[in-house]
Design a protein with these regions (language model features):
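Fe(II)/2-oxoglutarate oxygenase catalytic core
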Residues: 1-148
Length: 148
């Protein structure tokens, strides 16, 4: 018998907007997004992970379809509102994975140490859901020195 997981979004989650860089790029931070984030940790712990075939410094496993669908239903209206997109804008998920950095900082190659851009399309968004506390890192935003 398959175990059922709670993928429900916390309706009391707080949304904070910050603006970064010279262009004041809008970033949304949603704290306490999931009602039961431990369910995702349990799922991730039970999945087979493989080395990613790009410069990603770790391993990945596809997220469950049910979770991906729930995530999309929850974040699309938030993105549409805060980025002033038309309702039912057609945003879709292209990839949803559990990811775990496994290389130590000293083992990273030059490309893995460099800041990167996820995409340059105006209506492509990255959604990151951290399942660990801040002791395990986070995300930072940088600007290339020559463009300052």
């Amino acid at each position: 018998m398959n175990k059922t997981y709670n993928y429900a979004v916390n309706t009391a989650a707080s949304i904070t907007q910050i603006n970064v860089g010279l262009e004041q790029e809008k970033i949304l931070i949603i704290d306490d997004f999931m009602e039961s984030p431990e369910a995702l940790v349990d799922i991730a712990a039970s999945l087979p992970f493989t080395q990613y075939k790009t410069q990603y410094p770790g391993i990945k496993s596809p997220a469950p379809t049910e979770y991906t669908q729930q995530l999309l239903r929850a974040v699309v209206p938030i993105i549409e509102k805060h980025y002033e997109l038309p309702p039912r804008s057609g945003l879709e998920c292209t990839n949803c994975s559990f990811s775990l950095v496994t290389l130590a900082e000293n083992d990273l190659n030059l490309i893995q140490r460099s800041p990167h851009r996820d995409a340059s399309y105006p209506y492509q968004f990255a959604v990151l859901l951290y399942l660990c506390n801040s002791d395990h890192g986070g995300t930072a935003f940088y600007r290339h020195n020559l463009t300052q």
